[in-house]
């Protein structure tokens, strides 16, 4: 028997079921995909605009939203984001951290980046049935990413990321199947960002980004037959600077994202009397087939939409206010929330925070706060 700070081990099942609220997940990721933590918005700025950052990615967090955007950024920057994750569970040791760094290097003709994503699932107590404590373990998930971006043309940036993923849900054989709840994999991202230089009134005001992320082999917790795909995700982002003046600037952003995972339901074999003879494991398409077959499963109904607006005051930019909205089809996750945010910039320092207000009452993501600190120099 396993307990987390006095609560039954089944709590971790619930936590994993709503992490990132992608789709229901069981302990060993028997839902739409494994490691959904890779889809969590990693910075307060984009989160304050409805989790839309695919085109307005002009800081170190671009390594997540669109690594190609790093090709347009001079100098160096380091940023750190922290969030107490799923505050409805009131677990102080359930948190999310994201550390990122970028450096534009003229001698290699582009920008290098590195980031670390860490999700703590908390500490759990191993007990006997009486229950006598036998020990503890901590569940966590980790990703380490390195990237490179360069300009193919003056108005077109290209980027790539390479990533190592480690998931340690339980370093013990919870399901008594001879395997621990631990798995690792690798993945890569490819991205492009277009910033047109000659579009009349939209010159230097429009950005269009495309990012295909988390391409890689499946995660295997139990055995190869039960392996689950990574959350391969396609993101299209559009950003426009709708007001541009010396002291007042307004940005509008919208992102469309689609999980490119195709899972088929289990096949049930029945006898002549209608009794169940066997149930097969769900079938999942491998890459690259899933990049295309996923669209055969409610093609556009599974597209999520995030949109927002950002107002900056100051010359240079000093104070920002942000507002956004995120929508997901009720049949495929039903995430609907408003987001609010603010930020300040002074010299090389910056601070952003965001607040998520879920439309659905008592949603696990409701009242989520993110805080981001950043330092940028050599601009």
What is each residue range found by the language model?
Residues 1-9:
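N-terminal secretory signal peptides that target proteins for export/translocation
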Residues 28-379:
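Subset of outer-membrane beta-barrel
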């Amino acid at each position: 028997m396993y307990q987390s700070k006095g609560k039954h081990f089944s709590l971790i099942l619930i936590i994993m079921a709503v992490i990132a609220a992608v789709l229901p997940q069981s302990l060993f990721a028997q839902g739409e995909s494994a490691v959904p933590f890779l889809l969590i918005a990693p910075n307060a700025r984009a989160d304050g605009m409805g989790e839309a950052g695919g085109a307005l990615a002009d800081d170190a967090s671009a390594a997540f939203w669109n690594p190609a955007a790093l090709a347009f950024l001079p100098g160096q920057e380091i940023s750190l984001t922290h969030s107490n994750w799923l505050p409805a569970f009131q677990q102080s040791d359930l948190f999310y951290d994201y550390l990122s760094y970028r450096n534009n290097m003229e001698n290699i003709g582009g920008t290098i980046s590195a980031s670390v994503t860490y999700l703590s699932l908390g500490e759990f107590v191993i007990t006997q049935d009486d229950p006598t404590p036998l020990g503890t373990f901590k569940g966590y998930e980790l990703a380490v990413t390195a990237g490179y971006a360069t300009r193919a043309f003056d108005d077109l940036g290209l980027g790539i990321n390479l990533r190592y993923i480690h998931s340690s849900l339980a370093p013990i054989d919870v399901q008594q199947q001879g395997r621990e709840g631990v798995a690792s994999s690798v993945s890569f991202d490819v991205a492009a960002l277009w910033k047109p230089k000659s579009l009349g009134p939209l010159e230097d005001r429009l950005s269009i980004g495309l990012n295909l992320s988390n391409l890689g082999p499946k995660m295997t917790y139990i055995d190869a037959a039960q392996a689950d795909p990574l959350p391969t995700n396609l993101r299209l982002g559009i950003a426009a600077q709708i007001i541009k003046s010396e002291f007042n600037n307004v940005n509008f952003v919208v992102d469309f994202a689609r999980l490119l995972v195709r899972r088929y339901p289990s096949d049930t074999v029945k006898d002549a009397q209608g009794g169940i003879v066997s149930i097969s494991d769900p079938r999942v398409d491998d890459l690259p087939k899933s990049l295309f077959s996923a669209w055969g499963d409610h093609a556009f109904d599974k597209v999520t939409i995030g949109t927002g607006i950002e107002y900056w005051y100051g010359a240079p930019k000093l104070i920002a206010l942000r507002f956004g909205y995120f929508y997901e089809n009720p049949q495929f996750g039903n995430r609907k929330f408003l987001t609010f945010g603010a930020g300040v910039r002074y010299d090389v320092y910056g601070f952003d925070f965001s607040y998520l207000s879920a439309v659905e009452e008592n949603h696990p993501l409701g009242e989520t706060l993110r805080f981001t600190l950043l330092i940028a120099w050599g601009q």
